[in-house]
């Protein structure tokens, strides 16, 4: 092996290595007409010689490994070869992979930039991996080097003539291997001898492990509530496992038995790319009704707790606990319906009471009932109408012990008293209240057909406090408040709507000033309604008035020393004096 040594640069700037390389390559090229080298043209025409030349040509520019007789291995780019009697080659960017002693070289990561010449007497073999030998492969590699070309599927299938992938087969365990269904405790089996990596490292290598489980997991605080937390965690886990799923893989992991109606392979079944989003619901062994029952049980377990206690699988204490929870839940549901009916009736009562104005309440000194009693009577009437409207809902809502309805004569008497009171006050009302009075009377007459509760029950319902705020106080109207009635004379009459005034401001002409060459033009007076007016309280010199456009910029008027400033005058409108303030207690 004689490597080519680096030589200094020549005087013309080119290195001697280039000329030596070109001279050696010229001597290495065979010539058919040259017979001085000891071989003739017939030796090149042999099939083995042609095949060797073809393989050598295919290796040019590819990464190869060259094995020598002394055991050394070089790796580099195949650059040139001498196909004459001896088969010497030249490697470019060659590096030593393995020396003659069989040890790997440390200079593998630092490839040499030299041209390495290997004579034929030291060469054993040349190994080239992934070398294209067919013309199709060469054309494919050349076409794939074009990054700007758009490659379609059909074009790619024509380029790469590769073998088809082998068909996947399902894994079948050997018969002598035991079945380990539980992989969590696989090392606890007796045939595994309880293998522990920390003990093995300590026994074999003397290494003491510093592994702390609390650094990677959540530390469980043992206490009186630990058992309840574990039961709750197991219940949530059972709910998750018992949920319905549309994924075949998840269903199999949860232990759901699937029938053999799936005509798909194992790859499609467990692949994440070609996942099956839907499958037939009849794949389960249970029918559709049992599946719905399981789904309802999951919802009930999530809301009221585990339902396994009702089946007798849990201890007696647990069953009693769930039985109490079911009873409490039913009680809460009944109370919720009662509160809902009470809130709806109370809402209806407030809505109808808000329609009646404050004039329905009597004035102080009247022998009719006060305002609070009247409000309670109205509330009891509407509550009775809402409670006794649907008798079928009484047993569900918990009103089995409600008192019987009051006689119609008693109802008609009370509502007649209210209607008479409303009519008497409507006669003394002011003119603008006739429409609202008619609507209120119609509402009162329509409410006269509704039954009410007894006075005792209505009083108990009206005296209840809100369940939202225990410290809330009951709101009652002030019975000593005086009703406010505005007098017709104090009200301001509504004047007809005046048309929108679009006029301009008119000013009297400015008197002539001595020495002023600029004169203001005057025009005729603008007819129509003229207010507001701006004028000077001085003697006008001309009947004409100067016109100022409202959209034009206004400039100050030139004034004489003795001239007074213009005054803006607004004509007063006839109005009556306002109502005097009588104080806070008068309302």
Curated annotation (Swiss-Prot):
Domain (Sm) ranges: 51-132
Low complexity composition bias: residue spans: 431-464
A Pfam family that the UniProt record links to this protein: LsmAD
InterPro entries: ATXN2-like, LsmAD_domain, PAM2_motif, Sm, SM_dom_ATX
Bias (Polar residues) ranges: 486-498
Single annotated GO MF: RNA binding
Signal peptide positions (record): none
Matching PROSITE patterns: SM
Keywords of this entry: Repeat
Descriptive protein name: Polyadenylate-binding protein-interacting protein 3
Taxonomic placement: Eukaryota, Viridiplantae, Streptophyta, Embryophyta, Tracheophyta
